[in-house]
Amino acid sequence: ADGQNQVKLRGVVHFDGRYLANDDPNDLSDTWPATRIRPIIEGTVGGIYDFRFTPDFGQGRTVIQDAYVTGRFNPSFQVTAGKFKAPVGLERLQSAHDLRFVARAFPTSLAPNRDLGLQVGGKLVDSRLDYAVAFLNGSNDGASSETFGDVDINDDKEWAARLFAHPFAESDSFALRGLGLGIAATYTDQDGTVAQPLLPSFRTPAQSTFFRYR
Protein backbone atom coordinates (compact mmCIF):
# COMPACT_ATOMS: atom_id res chain seq x y z
CA ALA A 1 0.00 0.00 0.00
CA ASP A 2 2.94 2.34 0.57
CA GLY A 3 4.30 1.77 -2.94
CA GLN A 4 7.66 0.51 -1.70
CA ASN A 5 7.10 -2.86 -3.37
CA GLN A 6 4.84 -3.26 -6.37
CA VAL A 7 4.43 -5.09 -9.67
CA LYS A 8 2.51 -3.74 -12.67
CA LEU A 9 1.26 -5.68 -15.68
CA ARG A 10 0.33 -3.83 -18.83
CA GLY A 11 1.04 -3.90 -22.54
CA VAL A 12 0.83 -2.31 -25.95
CA VAL A 13 -0.47 -3.63 -29.28
CA HIS A 14 -0.03 -1.75 -32.56
CA PHE A 15 -1.34 -2.84 -35.95
CA ASP A 16 -0.24 -1.12 -39.13
CA GLY A 17 -2.01 -1.14 -42.51
CA ARG A 18 0.46 -1.05 -45.42
CA TYR A 19 -1.18 -0.61 -48.80
CA LEU A 20 1.09 0.63 -51.59
CA ALA A 21 0.12 1.94 -55.02
CA ASN A 22 2.02 0.90 -58.15
CA ASP A 23 4.47 -1.21 -56.17
CA ASP A 24 6.27 -4.35 -57.29
CA PRO A 25 4.39 -7.27 -55.65
CA ASN A 26 7.62 -9.26 -55.65
CA ASP A 27 9.25 -6.58 -53.50
CA LEU A 28 6.50 -5.33 -51.17
CA SER A 29 3.08 -6.74 -50.33
CA ASP A 30 -0.07 -5.01 -49.11
CA THR A 31 -0.53 -6.27 -45.58
CA TRP A 32 -1.74 -5.71 -42.02
CA PRO A 33 1.34 -6.38 -39.85
CA ALA A 34 1.35 -6.46 -36.07
CA THR A 35 4.19 -4.03 -35.49
CA ARG A 36 4.15 -4.25 -31.68
CA ILE A 37 2.77 -6.92 -29.35
CA ARG A 38 4.42 -6.18 -26.02
CA PRO A 39 3.33 -7.46 -22.62
CA ILE A 40 5.12 -5.38 -19.99
CA ILE A 41 6.12 -6.39 -16.48
CA GLU A 42 7.52 -3.62 -14.32
CA GLY A 43 7.70 -2.75 -10.69
CA THR A 44 9.61 -1.47 -7.67
CA VAL A 45 11.46 -3.27 -4.90
CA GLY A 46 12.26 -1.58 -1.61
CA GLY A 47 11.22 1.82 -2.93
CA ILE A 48 14.61 2.14 -4.65
CA TYR A 49 15.02 -0.49 -7.35
CA ASP A 50 12.81 -0.32 -10.42
CA PHE A 51 12.72 -3.13 -12.97
CA ARG A 52 11.17 -3.62 -16.39
CA PHE A 53 10.87 -6.65 -18.65
CA THR A 54 9.31 -6.28 -22.11
CA PRO A 55 9.21 -9.08 -24.69
CA ASP A 56 7.92 -8.23 -28.16
CA PHE A 57 6.07 -10.70 -30.39
CA GLY A 58 5.37 -8.27 -33.22
CA GLN A 59 6.50 -8.56 -36.84
CA GLY A 60 6.60 -12.35 -36.69
CA ARG A 61 9.53 -12.62 -34.29
CA THR A 62 10.29 -12.74 -30.58
CA VAL A 63 12.62 -10.09 -29.17
CA ILE A 64 13.41 -8.87 -25.67
CA GLN A 65 12.97 -5.10 -25.93
CA ASP A 66 13.63 -4.12 -22.31
CA ALA A 67 15.32 -6.03 -19.51
CA TYR A 68 16.85 -3.69 -16.95
CA VAL A 69 17.05 -2.64 -13.32
CA THR A 70 17.37 0.99 -12.16
CA GLY A 71 18.62 2.00 -8.74
CA ARG A 72 17.12 5.37 -7.72
CA PHE A 73 19.64 6.15 -5.00
CA ASN A 74 19.11 9.90 -5.30
CA PRO A 75 17.22 12.14 -7.76
CA SER A 76 20.60 13.31 -9.02
CA PHE A 77 22.18 9.84 -9.17
CA GLN A 78 20.47 6.83 -10.70
CA VAL A 79 22.11 3.73 -12.14
CA THR A 80 20.56 1.52 -14.84
CA ALA A 81 21.96 -1.85 -15.92
CA GLY A 82 20.70 -4.24 -18.60
CA LYS A 83 19.04 -3.66 -21.95
CA PHE A 84 17.46 -0.22 -22.30
CA LYS A 85 17.10 2.70 -24.70
CA ALA A 86 20.34 4.52 -25.44
CA PRO A 87 20.09 8.13 -24.15
CA VAL A 88 20.30 9.78 -27.57
CA GLY A 89 17.20 10.25 -29.76
CA LEU A 90 14.46 12.47 -28.30
CA GLU A 91 11.57 10.70 -30.04
CA ARG A 92 13.15 7.31 -29.41
CA LEU A 93 13.10 7.94 -25.67
CA GLN A 94 9.36 8.53 -25.78
CA SER A 95 7.31 5.47 -24.92
CA ALA A 96 5.46 3.69 -27.72
CA HIS A 97 2.32 4.42 -25.67
CA ASP A 98 2.76 8.15 -26.26
CA LEU A 99 3.43 8.21 -30.02
CA ARG A 100 0.97 10.14 -32.14
CA PHE A 101 1.58 7.75 -35.03
CA VAL A 102 2.50 4.06 -35.19
CA ALA A 103 5.84 4.83 -36.89
CA ARG A 104 8.46 7.26 -35.67
CA ALA A 105 9.88 10.03 -37.89
CA PHE A 106 12.85 9.50 -40.22
CA PRO A 107 15.39 11.43 -38.05
CA THR A 108 14.92 8.84 -35.32
CA SER A 109 16.58 6.27 -37.61
CA LEU A 110 19.84 8.22 -37.23
CA ALA A 111 20.02 7.42 -33.51
CA PRO A 112 20.58 4.02 -31.87
CA ASN A 113 17.64 2.22 -30.30
CA ARG A 114 18.12 -0.22 -27.42
CA ASP A 115 21.47 -1.54 -26.27
CA LEU A 116 23.11 -3.49 -23.47
CA GLY A 117 25.22 -1.70 -20.91
CA LEU A 118 25.38 0.55 -17.88
CA GLN A 119 23.99 4.07 -17.50
CA VAL A 120 24.33 6.79 -14.87
CA GLY A 121 21.88 9.69 -14.88
CA GLY A 122 19.61 11.92 -12.87
CA LYS A 123 18.09 15.35 -12.40
CA LEU A 124 19.97 18.47 -11.31
CA VAL A 125 19.18 22.15 -10.60
CA ASP A 126 15.74 21.51 -9.07
CA SER A 127 14.95 18.97 -11.81
CA ARG A 128 15.52 21.54 -14.54
CA LEU A 129 18.47 19.65 -16.01
CA ASP A 130 18.48 15.94 -16.90
CA TYR A 131 21.73 14.15 -17.65
CA ALA A 132 22.67 10.62 -18.69
CA VAL A 133 25.96 8.92 -19.55
CA ALA A 134 25.98 5.33 -20.80
CA PHE A 135 28.66 2.74 -21.58
CA LEU A 136 27.22 0.31 -24.14
CA ASN A 137 28.09 -2.58 -26.41
CA GLY A 138 27.19 -0.42 -29.40
CA SER A 139 24.40 -0.79 -31.97
CA ASN A 140 23.76 0.53 -35.46
CA ASP A 141 21.81 3.71 -36.14
CA GLY A 142 18.11 2.96 -35.90
CA ALA A 143 18.79 -0.56 -34.63
CA SER A 144 19.00 -2.45 -31.35
CA SER A 145 21.47 -4.91 -29.92
CA GLU A 146 19.37 -7.90 -31.04
CA THR A 147 20.67 -7.19 -34.55
CA PHE A 148 23.75 -9.11 -33.38
CA GLY A 149 21.89 -11.52 -31.13
CA ASP A 150 22.26 -9.33 -28.02
CA VAL A 151 25.96 -10.16 -27.84
CA ASP A 152 28.90 -7.93 -28.70
CA ILE A 153 30.80 -9.07 -31.79
CA ASN A 154 33.99 -7.14 -30.93
CA ASP A 155 35.89 -5.62 -28.02
CA ASP A 156 35.04 -2.00 -28.91
CA LYS A 157 32.34 -0.25 -26.92
CA GLU A 158 30.21 2.88 -27.33
CA TRP A 159 29.74 5.94 -25.14
CA ALA A 160 26.46 7.84 -25.20
CA ALA A 161 25.67 11.07 -23.35
CA ARG A 162 22.71 13.40 -23.11
CA LEU A 163 21.82 16.74 -21.50
CA PHE A 164 18.28 18.07 -21.54
CA ALA A 165 17.20 21.32 -19.87
CA HIS A 166 13.80 22.72 -18.88
CA PRO A 167 14.82 26.35 -18.24
CA PHE A 168 11.26 27.60 -17.75
CA ALA A 169 9.86 24.67 -15.76
CA GLU A 170 8.46 27.01 -13.09
CA SER A 171 7.12 29.60 -15.52
CA ASP A 172 3.48 30.71 -15.38
CA SER A 173 3.33 30.44 -19.16
CA PHE A 174 2.12 27.04 -20.36
CA ALA A 175 4.07 27.35 -23.63
CA LEU A 176 7.34 28.19 -21.89
CA ARG A 177 6.84 25.65 -19.11
CA GLY A 178 6.89 22.82 -21.64
CA LEU A 179 9.92 24.09 -23.56
CA GLY A 180 12.97 21.83 -23.50
CA LEU A 181 16.46 22.20 -24.95
CA GLY A 182 18.87 19.33 -25.25
CA ILE A 183 21.93 17.82 -26.85
CA ALA A 184 23.06 14.20 -27.17
CA ALA A 185 25.96 12.38 -28.78
CA THR A 186 27.61 8.99 -29.14
CA TYR A 187 31.23 7.99 -29.63
CA THR A 188 32.71 4.70 -30.79
CA ASP A 189 35.53 3.43 -32.97
CA GLN A 190 34.58 0.05 -34.39
CA ASP A 191 35.76 -1.80 -37.47
CA GLY A 192 33.36 -3.99 -39.39
CA THR A 193 34.01 -6.99 -41.59
CA VAL A 194 32.57 -8.23 -44.87
CA ALA A 195 30.27 -10.55 -42.93
CA GLN A 196 29.41 -7.88 -40.32
CA PRO A 197 29.92 -4.45 -41.92
CA LEU A 198 28.35 -2.63 -38.92
CA LEU A 199 26.59 -0.24 -41.30
CA PRO A 200 22.87 0.49 -41.10
CA SER A 201 20.30 0.62 -43.87
CA PHE A 202 17.30 2.94 -43.77
CA ARG A 203 13.67 2.05 -44.53
CA THR A 204 10.39 3.84 -45.00
CA PRO A 205 7.50 3.10 -42.60
CA ALA A 206 6.34 0.59 -45.25
CA GLN A 207 9.69 -1.20 -44.80
CA SER A 208 11.01 -0.30 -48.25
CA THR A 209 14.79 0.25 -48.13
CA PHE A 210 15.60 3.69 -49.55
CA PHE A 211 19.27 3.92 -48.56
CA ARG A 212 22.12 1.58 -47.67
CA TYR A 213 25.86 2.03 -47.46
CA ARG A 214 28.05 0.30 -50.01
Indicate where each model-derived feature is located:
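Outer membrane beta-barrel
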Residues: 2-141, 147-191
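Detector for outer-membrane/organellar transmembrane beta-barrel domains
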Residues: 174-214
